[in-house]
Amino acid sequence: MDHPSTSSLPRKKVKAGVKKAGKKTGKKTTGKKKTTPSAIGNRKGKGAACLLVLLAVLSYLAALSLGLYIMTGCISTTAQSNNIYLAELSTNTTYDMSLRVGYFGGCVSVTELTEAPYTGRNSSTQTSTHCVSNLRRKNLDDLSEDLWEPLKLNSSTIQSSLQTFFNTTLPQAKHLQENVFFCEPPLVHLLLFFVTGIMLFVAMTGTSRKRSYRAMLVTAIALSAFSLALALVTVLGSLQSMNALLNTSASGAQRALGDSLYISRGKAMLGVQGALVAIVAVFYLTMGVVFVRRTPEGGAGYIIQAFQNVRGPLKRMGRR
């Protein structure tokens, strides 16, 4: 009777030993460290975030440079600034003369024919250009002297023709600056873009748990929208104003005003303004993607939560 019970005991011990051995081997195999898909995803995410920040910084600097370039058009001849103008008043009579108008400054160019000695033939042309930083001065006589005196013209005949040209074009140039091409929209856009860019870069280093942080972010978003709208208004305003002056569509380039006087649009200025709008849009879009990637809720949840935190203080201020 006792024989079957004694024979079953070793079998149970063997099975238990097999189970223990299996557990030990399992521990050894799982002890090795392997690269998980989540770690690879984190590396890719950090690389994408760095690229986005780099794109934001580059677009921010490029937009600021273009904005300053637009505002300083026709202020001086350095960096080809005299080629960035809104409109040009020109004549092609005995001497080719032109007056280019920017938001603040203006440039005059005079082309003379130089004769080769002992031949009497026209050998070449010489163009003299000078710019003034402020074309909005009230005294036209002083303004005309500041424009033509540094040119160092060769004959008194050219000076007389240039003075007649200024008597006709300077009042029109001042009218264009004061009543057609307003300097306020591009100037306010540049200031708002500079301020909102700094606010957004500072917000990247903060935390979304503080209400002051979210209030600053909402303010930056509102000012950013206004800045982008001003950039768009500037380029469309320049295009529509010149279309009205030329009495043509965007493809028209020049119109005769009478007495061999012409007005033409500044195509380079229009191109730079369009590029500025595109770069500003890229900057704000990139910054939006950067902030959306920081929150698991996504962009809509992030903005809604920020507005909810600001809505309470605004209601209290309205009640007061």
Curated annotation (Swiss-Prot):
The chain crosses the membrane at residues 51-71, 186-206, 216-236, 272-292. Glycans are attached at residues 92, 122, 154, 167, 247. It is found in: Membrane. Pathway: Secondary metabolite biosynthesis; terpenoid biosynthesis. It comes from the Eukaryota. Residues 1-40 are annotated as: Disordered. It is a multi-pass membrane protein. It holds the Pfam family Fig1. GO terms for biological process: terpenoid biosynthetic process. GO terms for cellular component: membrane. Residues 10-35 have a biased composition (Basic residues). Keywords: Glycoprotein, Membrane, Transmembrane, Transmembrane helix. Part of the gene cluster that mediates the biosynthesis of an ophiobolin family sesterterpenoid. This is Uncharacterized ophiobolin family sesterterpenoid biosynthesis cluster protein.
